[in-house]
Amino acid sequence: MEHPGRIVVVSADIGAGHDRAADELAHRLRARGFAVDRLNLLHLLPHPVHRVVRETYRGVLHRLPWGYHALFRLTGSSQTAVRAIRALLRPFRRHLRRRIPPDTRAVVTTYPFANQLLGPLRRRGRLRVPVITYVTDFVVHPTWLAPGVDVYCAVRHAETHQASAADVTAVQPLVSRAFTRTGPEDLRRARQRFGLPAEGVLALVVAGSWGAGEVAATVAEVAAAGVRPVVVCGHNAALRHRLRGAGRHVLGWVDDMPALMRAVDVMVENAGGLTCQEALAAGLPVVTYRPIAGHGRANAAILARAGLSRWAATPQQLGPVLAAVIGTGPVAPSRDDVSQDPAGLVAEAARRAPPAGPAGTRRPLLDPVGDAVAVLAALLQSTGGLR
């Protein structure tokens, strides 16, 4: 049977949240009959550059969090900084356009910098199909915004950054239906599966796929509060090695997070991204503690304001907050039955759109000049050379 159209989903392997959202969207769209292509934005870069970009970002997050926070604030308050990023990415627009098949009916992004490439292509008429983005954070930061993007989607409690004026469509979270809260028997089986104690209160400590932030301090302080921590270190082997011992339950990368969330009583997190959306969908109480710089702190504030999590701002607050959350027991799963399924929104847009058609085979003669000028202007703007 002929499929109703092709949809391209663009993500990036910066952490795991962007890819997990893209995976779930692709799953839902395929269930609706669409052909789905997945693109990793960083694969547009030459392989050594791809690795350098990813590892530099990881290094800054781990070793220079103040630098990451400063960049997050700069791009949040300065349109010039966002335009500079867009200009620096301009040389890769054509390469991305050529990766979009002619029968594509819509392009969806789950990574902000993809919008800085696709938005201009759409605005200039080089991409005829709608560009839709799903914001994986609770804060819609200006780096997600680009002229030409048709629809911005975010979960219901998300907030636009103070410098943003975007019109955002509230949608259901892109988390697997497997994130559900079940009964005591499922808890027992889940604990047995992961080798966890059958009795006692367990706190799941998560820090993203890179194990970023003050994880060791968090683990020690959760234990000092009388709650046994279960730590997920993701791909951070060094962190896992450092935390092992003393009867701790320390895991690396976990494929079946729905099962692990059924095994614990509370989650302590520091980033507020997709894992937070998954915990809320599963009805697992969430405590934010020692949030990482940039988006972590911004998400923490929004989650606390919305009443979706409790933010323990100091070590002295952690124990009472954990006791209060655990004392109330499991919470009702945060299922949004009012907002639209993002897959339905994308499917509707794709059915109305004409096919993308072929990418231009000839590069306009002035494009290389424009690329060079844009990059030079971006560099001058970022250093204050243009006023």
Question: What do the predicted segments below correspond to?
Answer:
Residues P4-L45, T104-R105, T110, G119, ...:
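Soluble, non-transmembrane catalytic domains of enzymes that act on hydrophobic metabolites at membranes
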Residues A21, S77-H161:
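Active-site and donor-binding regions of nucleotide-sugar-utilizing enzymes
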Residues E185-V264:
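Donor-nucleotide binding loops and adjacent catalytic segments primarily
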Residues M257-A298:
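A donor-sugar binding/catalytic signature common to diverse glycosyltransferases
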Residues A304-G307, A313-P330, R352:
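C-terminal "capping" alpha-helix adjacent to the active site of nucleotide-linked donor transferases
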Residues G327-R387:
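C-terminal amphipathic helix plus adjacent low-complexity
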